């Protein structure tokens, strides 16, 4: 574990990025096995090839017309009367990219109703399977796909949260109840991102003074208490491929700056510091890639909120690239290219760019130091997508013509650093250095008793 200086002209602060323990790292090598029967699949619908190499499958029946809740109405506002619900209708992709799930609207008998919808993404063409039950769902419910094709749904009635698994059963939908949790007044419960093992699902119960991690799917009997973390936590990023190391953004009890911490679920919720850029800065972890160790960070250490990157377990400084702060837009990363072992600077990162004109896609690599801005497909489910190991970005979308489609975008090629005319006109082309050149950082050892995680040697 080492503490390193961040490049002074960019942030002027010290940064600490902690390595993971060796034991946990070994656990990350093994893939979890579900050990369950595959749920019954309906007959695969016939698909039709769409434009630009995308695929659009079946047309939904008129009796169950799919309505995109994010599509603007005549007033230009999303969702035509369901604006608040549309914001909550997230599109969640399983950790292995095989399935996705969302809540969507159907119009049946002149009445709009919410129902879960599962997308299959790992075949030759994507297709969607509706999972409606006898009663419509509340727009505030959450859905999360598992790697075996079942979909977890969280419902709330007053202070009681119930969990069930939904799966297709021919023409209908099967439901397996998993149990419920009751939360006290002022306690907020939310699902964490899909676990890397594909068979488990976790939730955060956020109270006034502490946060509880629950295993809500994959346990023996109902929700299982996993860990208590002092303080109010948010976010949630998996740091390994075994679903053991979880990063949370924690606000200390009594207030103070928000810092990312690592929670070891295999050690009863042992909490250790993960990010420490400045003593009074808010340092949040947005994304992490287990293969390369690339971290995407948002911090106000430079004086205001900036998007930066670092490497887990490295003594290299955290950098805040100028190209990731374009004017008058908000930039949020949502996917990192996997499979780039020990090459974090070569990872392609997909970003959602929100501006007055709407939402579109950005692609950036640390080594390229340039933000490529690309048009999104019509009906893009903004902020969702995944990379293949070969550098192809898959962007799910749904519109009136294609109710379930995936656009394929190859990552733009960056000019080689230090070569070609593009680097001679870097300012004009928008290619700006991440930070000013500085001497190599001098790493200061931390006493063993203060090291947050042990057993792994920091690369570099």
Positions of PLM-derived features:
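Short beta-strand elements that form the blades of beta-propeller/WD-repeat-like
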Residues: 96-108, 148-156, 197-206, 236, ...
């Amino acid at each position: 574990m080492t503490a390193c200086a961040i490049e002074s002209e960019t942030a002027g602060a010290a940064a600490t990025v902690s390595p993971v323990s060796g034991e946990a790292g070994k656990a990350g090598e093994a893939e979890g096995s579900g050990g369950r029967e595959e749920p019954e699949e309906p007959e695969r619908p016939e698909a039709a090839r769409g434009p630009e190499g995308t695929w659009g499958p079946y047309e939904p029946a008129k009796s169950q017309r799919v309505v995109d809740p994010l599509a603007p109405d005549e007033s230009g506002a999303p969702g035509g009367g369901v604006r608040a619900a549309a914001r909550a209708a997230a599109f969640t992709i399983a950790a292995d990219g095989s399935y996705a799930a969302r809540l969507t609207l159907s119009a049946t008998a002149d009445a709009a109703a919410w129902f879960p919808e599962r997308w299959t993404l790992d075949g030759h063409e994507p297709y969607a399977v509706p999972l409606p039950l006898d009663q419509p769902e509340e727009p505030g419910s959450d859905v999360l796909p598992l790697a075996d094709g079942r979909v977890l749904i969280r419902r709330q009635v007053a202070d009681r949260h119930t969990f069930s698994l939904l799966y297709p059963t021919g023409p209908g939908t099967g439901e397996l109840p998993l149990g419920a949790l009751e939360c006290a007044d002022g306690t907020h419960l939310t699902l964490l991102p899909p676990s890397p093992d594909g068979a488990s699902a976790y939730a955060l119960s956020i109270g006034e003074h502490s946060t509880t991690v629950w295993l809500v799917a994959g346990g023996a009997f109902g929700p299982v208490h996993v860990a208590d973390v002092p303080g109010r936590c948010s976010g949630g990023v998996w740091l390994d491929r075994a679903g053991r190391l979880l990063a949370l953004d924690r606000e200390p009890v009594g207030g103070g700056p928000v810092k990312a911490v690592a929670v070891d679920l295999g050690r009863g919720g042992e909490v250790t510091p993960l990010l420490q850029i400045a003593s009074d800065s808010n340092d949040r972890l947005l994304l992490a890639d287990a293969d390369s160790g690339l971290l995407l960070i948002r911090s106000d250490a430079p004086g205001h909120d900036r998007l930066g990157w670092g490497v887990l377990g490295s003594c290299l400084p955290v950098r805040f690239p100028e190209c990731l702060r374009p004017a008058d837009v908000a930039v949020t990363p949502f996917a990192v290219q996997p499979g780039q072992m020990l090459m974090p600077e070569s990872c392609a990162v997909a970003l959602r760019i929100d501006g007055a004109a709407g939402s579109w896609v950005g692609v950036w690599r640390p080594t390229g130091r340039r933000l490529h801005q690309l048009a999104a497909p019509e009906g893009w489910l903004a902020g969702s997508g995944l990379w293949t190991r070969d550098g192809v970005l898959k962007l799910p979308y749904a519109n009136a013509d294609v109710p379930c489609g995936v656009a394929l975008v190859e990552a733009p090629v960056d000019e080689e650093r230090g070569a070609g005319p593009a680097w001679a006109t870097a300012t004009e082309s928008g290619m700006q250095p991440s930070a000013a050149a500085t001497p190599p950082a001098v790493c200061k050892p931390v006493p063993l008793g203060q090291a947050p995680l042990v057993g792994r040697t920091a690369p570099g």
